[in-house]
Amino acid sequence: MPRYDAIVVICDNEDDHQILLRGLDEWFSEIDAFGDGVILGAARMDAREIPLPHNVVAFGDDGDRVGSFYAGDGILQLLTDAGGRIWISYFDEASYGFAKPDGTLGVSYMPGLARWDGIGSDPWFAYSDTGNQVGWCDCYAVNVGRTLVYACPYVDFPLVEIDASGVRSITPNPITRCTGLAVSNSRFDFFDHYRQNDAPVWSIRKGLREGGVVTETGREILTLPGSRSPTGWARGKIGRDGTLWLHEDGNPRQWYRYEIDS
């Protein structure tokens, strides 16, 4: 594709900082803060040979590139944490290419969820810790908090708790069909959307984790400011501890914040 320039605007309360990025060569659909700069990810990447093309690129606050790496095809979300680690979830069509011992291209499928400890580090994949206890067909929901990460992968939606060292626990979860997640200690709010009477509905199913199980404790239909019902599917679905950020399909400039009850 033709190279293009872009401007990133980072907002912090009433302050904002603009970063000019020059010569971008991929369609980057994912973005997050990374140090004083930003990191971008291209969701689709056709890798056919070694060396593998890079589809995640980091920039400093001056717009200069500080590094890049290959992160596979089929990225669902790219999120960074307070320690500078990079978390990437994948949808069901995802694949991850690698160099086999003979130097040719090998491909693995449905990687689910991966973590990089920094630019250029080797990836860690959640399936390496969970084995066949968890199916990572599609990482429907992920919440990257300050110290812990939670994921609910399709098809069984177990609640997988992860830290910087790996998987801490796998909890059976009766609340299936969740595409977003807000977390506060042992309380979990599972977001989903569906169509009812030809109109989109955004909903929350509340869960409590105790004694190694998740129990559903309530349900809630969400409305937008002004008691307005959403007009489209929810997009974004960025979970940060007790906060879930959402926007309506087709309107990525207007975001809404859901907070788990304190």
Describe the predicted segments one by one.
Residues V38-L40, I86, V149, F188-F190, ...:
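Hydrophobic beta-strand positions that form the internal "hydrophobic ladder"
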Residues Y4-D12, L52-G63, D102-G120, V201-E210:
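Beta-propeller blade signature
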Residues M1, G41-P51, I88-M110:
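Short, conserved, GDST-rich strand-edge loop motifs in beta-rich repeat architectures
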Residues M1-M45:
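Blade-loop segments of beta-propeller domains
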Residues R235-S262:
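Blade-level signature of beta-propeller repeat domains, shared across WD40, Kelch, NHL, RCC1
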Residues R22-D36, Y70-G83, N132-V142, N173-H193, ...:
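Repeated scaffold domains used in trafficking and secretory/extracellular systems
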Residues A43-D46, F91-E93, V155, Y194, ...:
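Residue-level signature of beta-propeller blades and closely related beta-rich strand-turn architectures
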Residues D15-G23, G63-Y70, D122-Q133, G166-P172, ...:
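A short beta-strand motif characteristic of beta-propeller blades
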